[in-house]
Amino acid sequence: MLSSSHLPTTIVTPKNVPTLGVLVGGGPAPGINGVIGAVTIEAINNGYRVLGFLEGFQNLILQDDSKIVELTIDSVSRIHFEGGSILKTSRANPTKKQEDLQKVVKQLQKFNVSLLVTIGGDDTAFSSMSVAKAANNEIHVVTLPKTIDNDLPLPYGIPTFGYETAREFGANVVRNLMTDASTASRYFIVVAMGRQAGHLALGIGKSAGSHLTLIPEEFLPTTDSTEPEVTFSRICDMIEASIIKRLYTSKKDHGVIVLAEGLLEYMSTDELKQAFGSSLKYDAHDHIMLAELDFGRLVRDEMRERMNRRGLKIAFTEKNLGYELRCAPPNAFDREYTRDLGNGAVRYLLNGGNGALITVQGVKMVPLSFDDLKDPRTGKTRTRQVDVSSEGFQVAKRYMIRLEKKDFEKEETLKGLAATAKCSVEDFIKQFKYLVQ
């Protein structure tokens, strides 16, 4: 199979021929190579030269001609089976400086690129919008929605490519952890990627049947005037309550808890600084680098301390679930999906289209205008969050182990929970009743 090390090494020179460019921004996701292959084949079959720009916008900003490769049908015809990206990727942000945007446009024009396909998530979509405007629409740009987070503003029920593979891979990991938990009598605290939305954590937890899955959306306010109720103590109270209830109802001292890393995104800066101190780092788009924070370890240590105080002998192990999902070989769904997306992107551009996110809805390719994707408050790409009022989320909750109002209404149950927690009924109510109000 072709890898980035096997790409053509011939130095690319500008040619006065119709040219389409393709680049990848942001983190990897299963299916990137499938898109690159589909775009390349369709463009060449329509008379275009196809250039791949290595490492996203980074080398366009640097105007490094050595980081450009010419793609051929032969070089991409079988790459759709492989994870990763033959064009690599980066998080370089050309919107930080106006001069960087102009460098990108100048470099694209130097190589006669009139059509540009970018593959990425919310930040890449925003950068693509900016490039199209900086080029005065002389370069037509489309973005293909890539992220395992599944948080781009597509219509509900339509995934971003890579999500389905990541969900399947993650659910299989959690299934194995469940067997390990049962065998070794321990709890696993699994932290799944998802900076601003809990789609991946919920998809993994629901399809694997984890005992509790927590995502940021269920803590978000219903009005803009209310602060999110995401605190470290609340998260740990919910986990502790789930463990106590499972121990009371089924006498089981093991299980798997899935947490979305995005829970950290909605905690206050003061709380994050208190928990992580100088280890807080930011990326080129000013996002806290959540993957660099050991959220699972923090929760693990807190739960160990809580159980020890109660005199309960329960073991905990943390597991971060993220990087191993991003470059998994795409499953059949994502291989088919990316072929549709790549083909649709080229056809849209050839028909004069510009400034859109390409989607497949039902049996049709549907472009979504960049302008319609923007959050009017920030000017950046909107985030699609989990709809906690949806039947899908409510079904997921019903199969979790959580405290419910009825647990506090039945005296026998309440006494049993308190006895399991080795505390008085009054203390149990004081600590946990707010979770069901």
UniProtKB/Swiss-Prot annotation:
Which cofactors are reported in the record for this sequence? Answer: Mg(2+); Mn(2+)
EC annotation from Swiss-Prot or TrEMBL? 2.7.1.90
**Where is this chain primarily localised?**
cytoplasm
Q: Which EC class, in a word?
A: transferase
UniProt binding sites for Mg(2+): 122
One Gene Ontology cellular component annotation held by this UniProt entry: cytosol
Keywords per UniProt: Cytoplasm, Glycolysis, Kinase, Magnesium, Metal-binding, Transferase
Q: Name one Pfam family in it.
A: PFK
Catalysed reactions, as listed in the record = beta-D-fructose 6-phosphate + diphosphate = beta-D-fructose 1,6-bisphosphate + phosphate + H(+)
- Entry annotation: catalytic residues: 149 (proton acceptor)
The record's subcellular locations are: Cytoplasm
One MF term from GO for this chain? Answer: metal ion binding
Q: Which family does it belong to?
A: Belongs to the phosphofructokinase type A (PFKA) family. PPi-dependent PFK group II subfamily. Clade 'Short' sub-subfamily.
Describe its function.
Catalyzes the phosphorylation of D-fructose 6-phosphate, the first committing step of glycolysis. Uses inorganic phosphate (PPi) as phosphoryl donor instead of ATP like common ATP-dependent phosphofructokinases (ATP-PFKs), which renders the reaction reversible, and can thus function both in glycolysis and gluconeogenesis. Consistently, PPi-PFK can replace the enzymes of both the forward (ATP-PFK) and reverse (fructose-bisphosphatase (FBPase)) reactions.
Query: What is the protein's name according to its record?
Result: Pyrophosphate--fructose 6-phosphate 1-phosphotransferase
